[in-house]
Amino acid sequence: MTHNAPPRLDPRRTPLVAVAAAGFLVALKGTGAWMTGSLALGSAALDSLIDLFVSAANFLVLRRSAQPPDADHAYGHGKFENLAALGQGLFLVAAAVVLVWSGVRRLIEGGAPRQTGWGVAVLAISLLVSLGVAHTLRQAAERSGSPALRADSLHYATDLWVNGAALGALLVVRWTAWSPADPLVALVVAAYVLRAGSSLALEAMGDLSDRGLPEQELRRIKAIVASFAPRVVGLHDLKTRRSGGQRFIELHLEIPRATSFEDAHALTVEVLRAVERELPRSKVFVHGDPV
C-alpha cells in the first residue's frame, strides 16, 4: 500500500497566497481601525499594508530570481531576492518610525478607542489568518531556501505579535477604561517591528556585499575535506558567499604531488559531491593543487 504525499505549493506561487491574505487583512483591519479609532489596530493595519506591497514584490522577484544564469548574469539572479529582503527590512523600519510618532502623539494628546468589541473580533480573525499564512510561507522558505520567502514568513510571524498585542490593548481598554494602553502597546509593537526590520535589512546587506557563510557551515566544509585524508593533505583559499537561496563555495585542495592527473580530478569531483550533499542548494568549485 502506498501513500501519496500531499501536494506542495510551488514556492514561486506561494507569494500569491500572501498577497491575497494581506489584501484581506488590510481591508479588515483598516475598517476596524476606522470604526474604533484604535491606534494599536491602526498600527496592525499599517503592518498588513506593508505586507501586501512586499508580498506582491516577492511574487515578481521570485519569478525573476528563478531564471537560469545567462550571458549577463553568469551566477544566476539570486541577488534579486536579497534586494527584496533589504527592501522589506527598510519598509519595516519605516513603519516602526511611523508607529513611534503616532504612539507618542496619542499619549500627549489623549483619546481612547470606541466600539472596542468590533476591534476585538477583527483582531481575533486576523490572528487566525496570519497564523495560517506564516506556516505556509515558512514551509515554502525551508524547502526553497529563499530569503524573500523567509522574510515574508517573518512578516506574518511578526503579525502574530502585532495582532496579539493590539488585541490585548483593546481588551484592557474595554475592561478597565485605561486609554493609555492603546498607544503604549503601539509603541511596544513599534520596537518589535524595528528590531525585526533592522535584523532583516542587515542580513540582506551582508549577502549583497558577499559576506561569507556562517562559521558553522565553514566548519562542516572543512570537516568534509578532512575526511578525505590522506588523499587530501589540506585546503586553502576557501571562499564562500550566498546569492538568494543558493550558496557559492570555492576551495583549493592540497593533493600529494605523486597523485596522477586522473586520480586528482576524480578526487576533486568526490569532494565537490560530498560538499553538495552536506549543504544543499550549493554551487561548489574545487581546484586541486599539488604539494
Regions flagged by a language model, labelled:
Residues 1-17, 72-80, 192, 196-291:
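Peripheral (non-transmembrane) domains and long loops of multi-pass membrane proteins
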Residues 1-216:
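Alpha-helical transmembrane cores and adjacent cytosolic helix/loop segments
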